[in-house]
Amino acid sequence: MVTLTNAESVLKTVYLDVVSNQLNTEINPFLAKIKQSTEDVWGKEVRKLAPFGINGGIGAGTEDGNLPSAYGNQYVQFVSTLKNLYGAIEISDKAIRASSNSVGAFVNLLNAEMEGLLKASAFNLGRMLYGDGSGLVATVTTAGTGSCVVDSVRNLIEGLAVDVYVGEEKTAAAKRITAIDRDTKTVYFADVNLAVTAGAKMYVQGSYNNELTGLGAIFSDSNTLYGVDRTAHRWMKPYVKAVDGDITEIVIQQAIDRLEEVNGSKVD
C-alpha cells in the first residue's frame, strides 16, 4: 500500500537526483557550457581567487646586465553568496488515498507533478542565466484591475506567480498569472480584484534580489561585481562592440579578434 512514508521515500530517492541532474545538464545550452564545480564553495559563500593581467617580472637585457625586477601575479577575490532555487509540489491526502491501492496510479500522479515542477524550474533557471539577479520579470506600463499591460512578456508564462512592487514596497504577493496576450502584452491574473499601477514592477514570488548573477548583471553599468570595484579594475567591464549597420561576418570576426588579443579568450 502507498503511504505518506512511501511517497516521501520516492521523492527523496528517485526524483531528487533526476531533477537535479536535468536542471544541471539539460536545461540550457548556455548553462551546459559553464564549468560547474563546488571546490570554491565555503560555507554560504563562493570565493574564487582570479588572476588578471600578466606577471611583471619580464624584460630583455644584456648577458651580464641586471635581471628584471620581480613583479608577481595580480589577483582579485570574487565573492558571491550561494543562491537557492526552490520548487514545491502539493498532493492532497485524498489524492494519495484514492491511489493507495494502485502503485502505478500514484507513480503517475507523482510523475505528472514532478514533470510540471521540472518544467517550471527549467523556465525560471533559464531566465535567471540572462537576468540581473533581481528577479524582475516585467514592468507595468498601463494600470489595470485584474489585468495590466507590461513592457515585455518574454519572461512571463501562464501559471507563474509574481510579487508586485511599487518602489521598495511589496503591494501584492504570489499573484498567479492565468493568461497572457502576447500581441498586446496584456497579463491577466487569477485575482480579478488585483489593482496594479503603472510603473509597478513584477518579480517572481519571493525572488526579489535573491536570484543568480546572470548576464544581465555582468553586462550592467554597475560599479561592483562579485565584490570587486569595476571602476578600479576596468578589465572586468565586458566588451561590447557597437554596430551601426548590419551585423556581418567581418564585424563578428573583429569582435572575436579583440577578445582573443586583449583577453586571451577562446570564443566558441
Give the positions of each predicted feature:
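Core alpha/beta structural scaffold of self-assembling particle/tube/pore-forming proteins
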Residues: 1-54, 71, 77-268
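Long, contiguous juxta-domain segments that are non-catalytic but functionally important
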Residues: 52-67
